[in-house]
Swiss-Prot record:
One of its GO terms (molecular function) is small GTPase binding. It holds the Pfam family Exportin-T. tRNA nucleus export receptor which facilitates tRNA translocation across the nuclear pore complex. Involved in pre-tRNA splicing, probably by affecting the interaction of pre-tRNA with splicing endonuclease. Belongs to the exportin family. Gene3D superfamilies: Leucine-rich Repeat Variant. It is found in: Nucleus; Cytoplasm. Keywords: Cytoplasm, Nucleus, RNA-binding, Transport, tRNA processing, tRNA-binding. This is Exportin-T. It comes from the Eukaryota. It comes from Pyricularia oryzae (strain 70-15 / ATCC MYA-4617 / FGSC 8958). GO terms for cellular component: cytoplasm; nuclear matrix; nuclear pore. GO terms for biological process: tRNA processing; tRNA re-export from nucleus.
């Protein structure tokens, strides 16, 4: 059998094996893994001599591992495995071993197997596990602490590391009873073998220092693992510390990494971070002399003399930073603990004073990884200081060096070359670090606002002063830093933003900001020859537009700078600058005055559109995609900001209306010609021509948006001036011509739909006669349900905006419009996306009907033109109320709301009332449409109970179903109010007998529930009791 297994493994792992044989071999091995007796043969295959091939032995051990882990071997089987493997280990790794040691992969697998046996047998069955492997380390029984057998030492250390990983690694998720098992094993080790294990570390450190760095490093890494769960007093003896201290301080004479030193620091970090009582922690920090150790490390040549050179040891810096971070974090915990005595608190306070300079040295390290390592502890310090009610001077004095260090770290380092493509990832990492540093600055400001204001304002003022004196000779990094910090300063200076949102805005900060902004605008910073500075300048001006609202005289100068900077010959710069120019103009359009002609002339060279079809994005569905990179699409999307900005600046109150129309015409005429020149090619399917027309349509719409976007939130939309409206009516006509020719293209329809929505405010009622053309073009035979839904949403705006003027147009277009919509509603569903789009179309259709009814346009639905379609509308709403019941609750709720509105519009005067003490119904129903009273009872009422009795309708467990239930209750009551006794008679003759109730409680609840939810709860209980 063993030969068969060996052969199968070799075939399975031989790349040259016949595929059919290989498949059979894998199948055989799969069966072998499930065989409860296979482990016995496999253990022999591993230990036998002469040895089998490495792959055979590796797979054999895997099968043994599986048996120990999963198959729950009995005590005799485990004992056999223990004896056979221990015998093998002694032969291979013990003193005087003749056999060659296993290759590393087999040593790892053997260590894993032995660890699994440890977990099963250490408590009972192999109590001498650790001492058995420790015995392998000594060549002479007479001198057992002379650990001179390197093979045995290496395996012993592997075993210790593996045992920790199995029972004490907190990063691994534990299942079932593993946690309990691991706790018991750790307790057993502490009781039996812990002192022996620690002594073995001491022996190894003592005997291998200066002889074998690999063993030293391995020993230290094992110590670092075990320290977290053993009695720390066993480790921090003077003898052990005397061995550790020289290793921590050892220096590689060539500079660069020293693995032993780094491992020693890691072990020390774990010792320092050991969880213990606050009093003990302060004593431990003192006992370990951590301040002196870290100070010496920081002052050592790798971190001091070699700083700023290629010999600087960043790995050592990061290791020391981890140690400092652990120590400071624990010190802060002691200070935050209210139960700590004064003596311990004083010691902790002194520790904080001692370690802060070391922390700030590492925080300021040129390597951002080192800086990031200590950010958590610096955050802890600032969080603690925020909680101190009356900040002592000793603590307040810490803030200035902290703030200075943060500001210094905010600066681009000397190797940075902003905007160079190969450094994009490095720049992104730094900008992410800046965000973390900003949070630290905010914490400083929260502790001492005046300090924050002084540092920030002095930094900016000094930089601007240096700029005046040195001009272009200044380092761009210094100016960039000042401008970046100025952007952060606004969180204090401006109200309702950032820190100021929690309290009143800082008048001191606001005053400083005003002074700084004056200096900034008056300086020559906009002429500095570096894109980082120029773009930051634009960002600052846009960020503080509120400054220009009260300092109008500075606007022309800044606007002139912006117009110049939007021409900057760097794509990434341009893309951002066009957006910032748009923001600046938009926010200050009431103050810029009549400058449109000058600006249009100045940026005219940026307006020509050059559509580019990229090889990978040439399909029609991708033409409208919004990119965030420097692709042609992304550049065009930014170019649109220029058109919108022209719209804003051309339609200011200071610009005469005839001039507004002239400016609009001057920008649109080239676009019209461009569209006309490309239309024929586009009709023949030319991708570039189609994309060009798409872009022109988008530009026309965006320009219109700038002209029409004047209303502030909450203000009534004003009718546009006829001169301006006439110009944009020409744009609408041009777009409609293109749409009529190209409406089979989804991307063209999308651009036209976008333009239509933006033209509404500048066209005013002039859009109404064009509506049939828009509908014809935008709702083509190839329009998706999603497109129909979006267009209905636009029509909602039109109906609401022109409700007094739209009646005649709506009367003409309603039936053809809804026929298109019904076609979309009837389309079969193919996949999840289709189902989502159908749900959206249903919701928009029902909302559109409600908008018509809510704006007193219901007469259009029953006009002579549309009355033949009225029955179809009602049927569609009733159907959606039913089909939405459990598939689309939102549509169902809207459908019942629509039926409720229909009852209100055509149900006639009330003949009954709902009140706590209702009177009996009086008179007969007189609906607005003859016979509509019976129509409501026979068509609307049944759908209510059809949904209620649907087994999948469960309002007690689903919030959306509950909303539908409430709308059903409201509809039932509305029908009663309009039909009175007719409805009661219907209920008594049909519904109540069907439900098996006398109806008294039903009628009482329906007629007295002034809140529809009360009647809804009754209906819910009624149906629930019948299920």
């Amino acid at each position: 059998m063993d030969a068969q297994i060996e052969n199968a493994i070799q075939i399975a792992w031989d790349p040259q094996s016949d595929p059919s044989l290989k498949s059979q071999a894998f199948e055989f091995l799969q069966q072998l893994r499930a065989d409860p007796s296979a482990w016995h043969i496999c253990s022999t295959l591993f230990t036998k001599s002469p040895r089998s091939a490495d792959v055979v032995r590796l797979v054999s051990l895997e099968i043994v591992n599986l048996a120990v882990q999963v198959q729950q071997l009995d005590a005799a089987s485990l004992a056999f495995l223990k004896d056979s493997l221990l015998d093998y280990v002694r032969r291979t790794y013990g003193p005087g071993a003749q056999d060659e040691p296993d290759v590393p992969s087999l040593q790892n697998k053997l260590t894993q197997t032995l660890t699994y046996l440890f977990a099963r047998l250490y408590k009972s069955g192999w109590e001498t596990f650790l001492s058995d492997f420790l015995a392998l380390t000594a060549s002479s029984e007479g001198n057992p602490r002379q650990r001179d057998n390197v093979r045995g030492v290496t395996l012993y250390l592997r075993i210790l590391g593996s045992v920790h990983d199995e029972i004490a690694d907190n990063m691994l998720a534990r299942q079932g009873n593993e946690g309990k098992r691991n706790a018991e094993l750790k307790d057993a080790i502490r009781e039996r073998d812990m002192r022996m294990v620690v002594e073995s570390w001491q022996d190894l450190l003592s005997q291998y220092t200066g002889r074998d760095d690999a063993i030293l490093e391995h020993t230290l890494k094992v110590m670092a693992k075990w320290v977290s769960w053993i009695d720390i007093s066993l480790v921090i003896t003077q003898d052990m510390l005397n061995l550790l201290f020289p290793l921590i301080g050892c220096v590689n004479p060539q500079g660069g990494a020293d693995m032993v030193r780094d491992a020693a620091i890691e072990a020390f970090t774990e010792i320092a971070g050991k969880k213990m009582k606050p009093v003990d922690k302060t004593e431990l920090i003192s006992f370990l002399n951590l301040r002196q150790i870290i100070s010496e490390l920081v002052a050592s040549p790798p971190l001091s003399q070699f700083r700023g050179t290629h010999r600087y040891d960043s790995d050592l810096a990061e290791s020391v930073a981890k140690l400092v971070n652990v120590v400071v974090t624990d010190v802060v915990k002691v200070l935050e603990d209210g139960s700590v005595g004064e003596e311990s608190r004083a010691k902790a306070g002194q520790h904080l004073q001692d370690f802060l300079p070391l922390l700030l040295r590492l925080f300021s390290d040129e390597y951002d990884e080192v800086c990031s390592t200590v950010i958590p502890s610096l955050t802890d310090i600032l969080t603690f200081l925020r909680k101190v009610p009356e900040l002592p001077d000793s603590y307040r004095e810490m803030l200035r060096p902290i703030m200075d260090a943060i500001v210094a770290k905010m600066r681009f380092d000397e190797t940075s070359h902003w905007f160079e493509g190969e450094e994009a990832e490095e720049e992104a990492d730094f900008l992410e670090l800046r965000k973390r540093l900003q949070n630290l600055q905010k914490s400083v400001a929260a502790v001492d606002e005046n300090l924050f204001i002084d540092v920030m304002s002095n930094l900016v003022a000094t930089t601007l002063q240096n700029l005046d004196e040195r001009g272009a000779q200044m380092d761009w990094r210094d100016i960039d830093l000042a401008l970046h910090e100025l952007l952060q300063f606004g969180e204090l200076a401006l109200p309702n933003q950032g820190l100021a949102a929690k309290s009143q805005p800082s008048s001191n900060a606001a005053e400083r900001l005003n002074v700084i902004m004056r200096k900034l605008v008056e300086s020559s910073i906009a002429d500095f020859p570096h894109p980082a500075v120029l773009l930051q300048y634009m960002e600052v001006c846009v960020r503080y537009c509120v400054f220009f609202e009260t300092n109008h005289s500075y606007i022309p100068r800044v606007l002139e700078n912006f117009v110049r900077l939007v021409h900057y010959d760097l794509t990434r710069f341009r893309v951002r600058s066009w957006y910032l120019f748009h923001r600046f103009v938009k926010q200050l359009r009431a103050q810029v005055g009549n400058v449109a002609e000058t600006i249009i002339q100045s940026i005219a060279d940026l307006l020509p559109i050059k559509a580019e079809v990229s090889a990978e994005d040439g399909s029609e569905d991708d033409m409208s995609s919004d990119q965030t990179d420097n692709s042609a699409d992304a550049i065009f999307n930014s170019q649109l900001y220029l058109f919108e900005a022209i719209g804003y600046i051309s339609s200011t109150s200071a610009t005469p209306v005839d001039k507004q129309a002239l400016y609009a015409r001057s920008v649109m005429e080239p676009l019209f010609r461009d569209m006309e020149n490309h239309l024929e090619k586009a009709k023949s399917g030319d991708a570039q021509a189609i994309l060009q027309i798409h872009h022109v349509i988008m530009a026309l719409g965006t320009l219109a948006h700038g002209f029409g976007d004047h209303a502030k939130p909450g203000h009534q939309r004003q009718a546009p001036d006829k001169l301006v409206s006439a110009e944009f009516a020409r744009a609408a006509e041009a777009i409609l011509i293109a749409l009529g020719q190209l409406n089979s293209r989804m991307d063209i329809r999308a651009a036209c739909r976008s333009a239509f929505s933006k033209l509404l405010n500048v066209l005013g009622s002039a859009v109404l006669p064009q509506l049939p053309q828009w509908i014809e073009g935008l709702l083509s035979q190839s329009s998706s349900k999603d497109e129909m839904a979006m267009f209905l949403r636009l029509l909602d705006q039109v109906v609401y905006g022109f409700k007094t003027e739209i009646s005649d147009v709506l009367n003409l277009l309603l039936t053809p419009l809804l026929q298109r919509v019904f076609g979309g509603l009837a389309e079969p569903i193919n996949g999840t996306d289709d189902e989502i789009q159908l749900g959206e179309l249903r919701r928009e259709y029902l909302t559109f009907l409600q908008i018509i009814l809510d704006n007193d346009l219901g007469a259009v639905l029953v006009s002579e033109t549309n009355q033949g379609f009225f029955e179809s509308i009602i049927s569609s709403v009733v159907t959606l109320a039913k089909t939405g019941g459990h598939v689309n609750m939102v549509a169902s709720r809207l459908a019942f709301c629509t039926l409720y509105r229909i009852v209100g519009v055509w149900g006639g005067p009330d003949v009954a009332n709902i009140s706590a003490n209702p009177s009996a119904p009086t008179g007969t129903p007189t609906p607005a449409i003859p016979g509509f009273d019976q129509f409501m009872i026979e068509r609307f009422h049944p759908v209510c109970f059809e949904v209620l009795q649907d087994p999948q309708f469960n309002p007690s467990k689903d919030a959306q179903s509950k909303q539908v239930l409430n709308e059903i209750a409201a509809l039932e009551q509305a029908i009663y109010v309009k039909t009175g006794n007719s409805f009661i008679s219907h209920l008594q003759s049909s519904l109540f007998p069907a439900l098996g109730i006398d109806g008294t409680e039903f009628l009482r609840c329906m007629t007295t529930s002034t809140d529809k939810k009360t009647f809804g709860n009754y209906l819910q209980n009624l149906i629930k009791n019948r299920r």
